[in-house]
């Protein structure tokens, strides 16, 4: 799974994308509703000289949650302190981060759904009252003291918003869902990335990469790097529509953005479960994958594109998926 080219989960080689990420809302492409709302919220907070309300960003991986957190920090003029749910194992880890924040800073917690209940309890007063409750001592002599924190903004990201507890979710004043990108916006993103990477690319080449990127900018930039390699070796370095088509065919990413794992999922439900309904645990066992991989990585795009229906009785293939077979 880790080496799957169109896996939207971040890989080590995706770190080069940091150089081409937009740094302001004006440069941010796509997500028009989110962009317009954040422009208003950020400008209003700046005019009042206040910290932005705590913000929760959720959606499938690879759509720009971390990028948006960076943009929020830059637009608000504060420093960005980043961590993730699995990293914050002890109460002291979070307390250290909170006490090092300065007024107007942005604390970004990725995968916030993986926070432990103990860490969540510390976050509640920090988010609500900008206070940190610390226990000093042990046993009968233990006492609690409150530390005042400077006004800050917590920006949290998750691919599993449904796993957040209600008390935590209710403390976010702003909640934004990122949607899959359309081909037009992805084409603009690919063209911009190509320009920043000094890749000569025709409009047709950008469209070909965009249409196979599964609505995900991270995948689009990853495919662009591989298509660039192909163009340099097999041609004169220019990425045309024909070159992009040949490169992506070689990489086994078809024109619908499906790869061998997607096709295997569809074929498995068709052959083993008679087109469904089939339980996700049964499909995962048949494919030798875990349930989380199916729900977070494979199914979102298949459902969004209309290949699979998620029903109370299980997963069902649509006629579109059957026709592909």
Swiss-Prot record:
Keywords: ATP-binding, Cytoplasm, DNA damage, DNA recombination, DNA repair, DNA-binding, Hydrolase, Nucleotide-binding. The keyword Repeat does not apply. ATP binds at residues 20-21, 62, 65-67, 128-130, 171, 181, 218. Residues 182-252 are annotated as: Small ATPAse domain (RuvB-S). GO terms for molecular function: ATP binding; ATP hydrolysis activity; four-way junction DNA binding; four-way junction helicase activity. Pfam families: AAA_lid_4 (PF17864), RuvB_C (PF05491), RuvB_N (PF05496). One of its GO terms (cellular component) is cytoplasm. Its EC number is 3.6.4.-. InterPro entries: AAA+_ATPase, AAA_lid_4, DNA_helicase_Holl-junc_RuvB, P-loop_NTPase, RuvB-like_N, RuvB_C, WH-like_DNA-bd_sf, WH_DNA-bd_sf. It is found in: Cytoplasm. DNA binds at residues 291, 310, 315. It is an enzyme of class 3 (hydrolase). Residues 255-325 are annotated as: Head domain (RuvB-H). Residues 1-181 are annotated as: Large ATPase domain (RuvB-L). Its main location: cytoplasm. Coiled coil: none annotated. GO terms for biological process: DNA recombination; DNA repair. It catalyses: ATP + H2O = ADP + phosphate + H(+). Mg(2+) binds at residue 66. The RuvA-RuvB-RuvC complex processes Holliday junction (HJ) DNA during genetic recombination and DNA repair, while the RuvA-RuvB complex plays an important role in the rescue of blocked DNA replication forks via replication fork reversal (RFR). RuvA specifically binds to HJ cruciform DNA, conferring on it an open structure. The RuvB hexamer acts as an ATP-dependent pump, pulling dsDNA into and through the RuvAB complex. RuvB forms 2 homohexamers on either side of HJ DNA bound by 1 or 2 RuvA tetramers; 4 subunits per hexamer contact DNA at a time. Has 3 domains, the large (RuvB-L) and small ATPase (RuvB-S) domains and the C-terminal head (RuvB-H) domain. The head domain binds DNA, while the ATPase domains jointly bind ATP, ADP or are empty depending on the state of the subunit in the translocation cycle. During a single DNA translocation step the structure of each domain remains the same, but their relative positions change. Homohexamer. Forms an RuvA(8)-RuvB(12)-Holliday junction (HJ) complex. HJ DNA is sandwiched between 2 RuvA tetramers; dsDNA enters through RuvA and exits via RuvB. An RuvB hexamer assembles on each DNA strand where it exits the tetramer. Each RuvB hexamer is contacted by two RuvA subunits (via domain III) on 2 adjacent RuvB subunits; this complex drives branch migration. In the full resolvosome a probable DNA-RuvA(4)-RuvB(12)-RuvC(2) complex forms which resolves the HJ. NCBIfam families: PRK00080.1, ruvB. This is Holliday junction branch migration complex subunit RuvB. It comes from Psychrobacter sp. (strain PRwf-1).
């Amino acid at each position: 799974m880790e080496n799957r080219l169109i896996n939207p989960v971040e890989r080590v080689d995706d770190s080069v994308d940091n150089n081409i990420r937009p740094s302001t809302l004006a440069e941010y492409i796509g997500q028009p509703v989110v962009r317009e709302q954040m422009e208003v919220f950020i400008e209003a907070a700046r005019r009042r000289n206040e910290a932005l309300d705590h913000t929760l960003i959720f959606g499938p991986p690879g759509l720009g949650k971390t990028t948006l957190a960076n943009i929020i920090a830059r637009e608000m003029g504060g420093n960005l302190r980043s961590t993730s749910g699995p990293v914050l194992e002890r109460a002291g880890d979070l307390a250290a981060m909170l006490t090092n924040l300065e007024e107007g800073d942005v604390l970004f917690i990725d995968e916030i759904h993986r926070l432990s209940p103990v860490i969540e309890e510390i976050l509640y007063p920090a988010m609500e009252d900008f206070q940190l409750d610390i226990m000093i001592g042990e046993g009968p002599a233990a006492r609690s003291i409150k530390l005042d924190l400077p006004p800050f903004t917590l920006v949290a990201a998750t691919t599993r918003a449904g796993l957040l507890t209600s008390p935590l979710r209710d403390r976010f004043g702003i909640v934004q869902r990122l949607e899959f990108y359309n081909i037009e916006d992805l084409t603009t993103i690919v063209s911009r990335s190509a320009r920043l990477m000094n890749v000569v690319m025709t409009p047709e080449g950008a469209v070909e990469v965009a249409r196979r990127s599964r609505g995900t900018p991270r995948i689009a930039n990853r495919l662009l790097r591989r298509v660039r390699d192909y163009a340099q070796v097999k041609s004169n370095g220019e990425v045309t529509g024909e070159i992009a088509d040949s490169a992506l065919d070689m990489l086994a990413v078809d024109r619908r953005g499906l790869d061998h794992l997607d096709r295997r999922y569809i074929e498995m439900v068709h052959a083993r479960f008679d087109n469904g309904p089939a339980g996700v645990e049964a499909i995962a066992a048949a494919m030798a994958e875990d349930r989380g991989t199916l729900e977070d990585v494979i199914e979102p795009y298949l459902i969004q594109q209309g290949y699979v229906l998620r029903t109370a009785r299980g997963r069902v293939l649509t006629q579109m998926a059957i026709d592909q077979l």
